[in-house]
Amino acid sequence: MEILMSITAGVLFMVGTYLILTKSLLRVVVGLILLSHGAHLLLLTMAGLQRGAPPLLHLEATTYSDPLPQALILTAIVISFGVTSFLLVLAYRTYKEHKTDDLDQLRGSADE
């Protein structure tokens, strides 16, 4: 299962990097979203997957599984949601202002 999750994280990184390098502003935002999802999946995979294991392993509660990776991923998801919404607002305002989402046209020429 961890192999499949690692491959999926790699595919998300690959597609996210490809989309970041394109000319469309919306594709860049989607690429950043996929890159952050790949990072979340990688962190979850690195924590180790235990199918059906409860957080408390015994009733005595002296040994328990580590909740830190899940808390870290939850925090990262909330932060990436805020960054994504901010990037979407910036992309929308840029499109409304310049009437294009092509990064080459937004960059301008050397004469300007």
Curated annotation (Swiss-Prot):
Alphabetic keyword roster: Antiport, Cell membrane, Hydrogen ion transport, Ion transport, Membrane, Sodium, Sodium transport, Transmembrane, Transmembrane helix, Transport
Location in the cell: Cell membrane
Signal peptide: none
GO BP terms: proton transmembrane transport; sodium ion transport
Coiled coil spans: none
Topology relative to the membrane: Multi-pass membrane protein
Single GO term (MF): antiporter activity
Main location as per UniProt: membrane
Listed GO CC annotations: plasma membrane
Family membership noted in the UniProt record: Belongs to the CPA3 antiporters (TC 2.A.63) subunit C family.
NCBIfam families: PRK08600.1, PRK12660.1
Role: Mnh complex is a Na(+)Li(+)/H(+) antiporter involved in Na(+) and/or Li(+) excretion and Na(+) resistance. Na(+)/H(+) antiport consumes a transmembrane electrical potential, and is thus inferred to be electrogenic. Does not transport K(+), Ca(2+) or Mg(2+).
Subunit description: Forms a heterooligomeric complex that consists of seven subunits: MrpA, MrpB, MrpC, MrpD, MrpE, MrpF and MrpG.
UniProt miscellaneous comment: Mrp-dependent antiport apparently occurs by a secondary, proton motive force-dependent mechanism, but the similarity of several Mrp proteins to membrane-embedded subunits of energy-coupled NADH dehydrogenase complexes raises the possibility that there is a capacity for electron transport that could provide a primary energy coupling option for Mrp functions.
Name of the featured protein: Na(+)/H(+) antiporter subunit C
Species assigned in the record: Alkalihalophilus pseudofirmus (strain ATCC BAA-2126 / JCM 17055 / OF4)
Gene: mrpC
